[in-house]
């Protein structure tokens, strides 16, 4: 049986090598949230995080699914504590009238304080934010003042890869293997947890959640 934890040696941003871990959810019981994760939300509503079987999963048979409705559903991996490193996930926006979004979060203090990078299939854009005391605000791209992330085709019903590499106050965002932009911010400087994120009524699938320290 395939282990949900796959250890690989991989190159990360800047220079050097880090030990990365990939979680596929494949050995977990379906129908409930993954053990060792905090399945919750930022704001009001009722998030629903569960491990489910899905025939389209990049790593079969299971995925992590968010099918509830809340301001910002988040699922946080409890045993992580990264200051500099990377986080990456494959995600598939399935449905949602208000939003069809998937994202990763890092330097998480709690469900109301973290950085978040997300891609949205309804808006066809990719944006990096900070969430402070439950309030989300977008961050300026290095070399550009103002604006709102970047326009990028995010096809609904298809799997995509979202990755953020972070070192100090600088964050590099990549989508489907292409670097889109970098951001600088000093709101959260200490190590924190990592996880995944959606918004509103987004039904989103996640698989191959990878991370490593620098």
Give a label for each model feature.
Residues 169-195:
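Short, solvent-exposed beta-strand-to-loop segments that form ligand-recognition rims
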Residues 32-63, 69-71:
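Extracellular glycan-recognition surfaces and repeat-rich motifs
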Residues 135-161:
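Short, aromatic/His-centered strand-loop micro-motif at the edge of beta-sheets
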Residues 20-41, 207:
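Extracellular carbohydrate-recognition regions
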Residues 24, 188-214:
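Ligand-recognition surfaces built from glycine- and aromatic
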Residues 30, 66-136:
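Secretory/extracellular carbohydrate-interaction modules
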Residues 158-172:
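Localized edge beta-strand/strand-to-loop motifs within extracellular or lumenal beta-rich domains
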Residues 7-16:
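Bacterial N-terminal signal peptides
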């Amino acid at each position: 049986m395939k282990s949900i934890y796959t250890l690989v040696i991989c190159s990360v941003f800047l220079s050097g090598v880090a030990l990365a871990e990939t979680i596929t959810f494949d050995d977990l019981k379906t129908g409930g949230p993954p053990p060792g994760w905090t399945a919750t939300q930022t704001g009001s509503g009722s998030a629903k995080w569960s491990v489910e079987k899905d025939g389209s999963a990049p790593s079969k048979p299971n995925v992590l699914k968010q099918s509830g409705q809340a301001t910002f559903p988040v699922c946080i991996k409890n045993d992580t504590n990264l200051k500099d490193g990377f986080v990456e996930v494959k995600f598939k926006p399935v449905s949602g009238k208000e939003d069809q979004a998937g994202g990763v979060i890092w330097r998480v203090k709690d469900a109301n304080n973290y950085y978040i990078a997300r891609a949205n299939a309804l808006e066809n854009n990719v944006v990096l934010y900070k969430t402070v005391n439950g309030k989300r605000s977008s961050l300026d791209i290095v070399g550009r003042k103002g604006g709102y992330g970047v326009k990028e085709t995010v096809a609904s019903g298809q799997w995509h890869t979202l990755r953020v590499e972070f070192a100090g106050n600088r964050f590099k965002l990549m989508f489907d293997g292409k670097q889109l932009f970098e951001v600088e911010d000093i709101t959260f400087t200490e190590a924190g947890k990592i996880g995944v994120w959606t918004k509103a009524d987004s039904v989103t699938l996640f698989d191959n959640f990878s991370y490593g320290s620098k």
